[in-house]
Regions:
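Catalytic and binding regions of secreted/periplasmic enzymes and modules that target cell-wall glycans
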Residues: 20-170
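Short, structural beta-strand-to-alpha-helix junction motif
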Residues: 1-18, 30
Length: 172
């Protein structure tokens, strides 16, 4: 599917149950994440436009294109993640940012959950208590994954080089 086809499918109700396409791709991106809800919202397409013009009617939402989404999440949507990879904040702050983005990731121990409802024990979703979301893995799992990712990034030559290389792949 092209970006334009996804935009249409995510805003058009189809079929007898009036269902529409909602979360798409490897990272299960919802309409607000890809396109924003209102003008001025942070969103993937707006972030990407800082680096390249995208013709939505031609650009496929393929695996290669979707590989750019981690950079968006790290830099724009949950900046503490990229700051950790650059050595400018703690792994706990990065893990907290992950928990805010993905309900299945537990908030780190002693961090507040959404609206300050609870203090996490390291196994609670940031959205605990909303009746819909629960963590599927502990904050320690996220912390370990972030540490491993940072090592890979550092071994590659640092965050800036990873970003540059990833963005260059889109232009090929």
């Amino acid at each position: 599917m092209t970006i334009a086809e996804i935009r249409r499918a995510q805003t058009t109700h189809v079929g007898p149950n009036k269902k529409h396409l909602f979360a798409v791709g490897i990272f299960q991106m919802i309409p607000g994440t890809i396109f924003g809800k209102r003008k001025g919202d942070k969103c993937f397409m707006k972030w990407l436009s800082n680096y390249r013009y995208i013709k939505e009617s031609e650009q496929l939402f393929d695996r290669k294109f979707q590989q750019l989404t981690p950079l968006y999440f790290w830099e724009d949507k949950q900046e503490p993640i990229s700051l950790y990879f650059m050595g400018k904040t703690t792994v706990e702050e990065a893990a907290y940012a992950v928990s805010k983005e993905w309900a299945s990731a537990a908030a780190p121990k002693n961090k507040e959950t959404y609206k300050g409802k609870f203090i996490s024990n390291g196994y609670m979703s940031y959205y605990a208590g909303d009746g819909m979301n629960k963590a599927h893995y502990s904050a320690d799992v996220t912390i370990d994954a972030l540490k491993e990712t940072k090592k890979i990034i550092d071994d590659f030559g640092g965050y800036s080089l990873v970003k540059e290389t990833t963005l260059l792949a889109l232009n090929k």
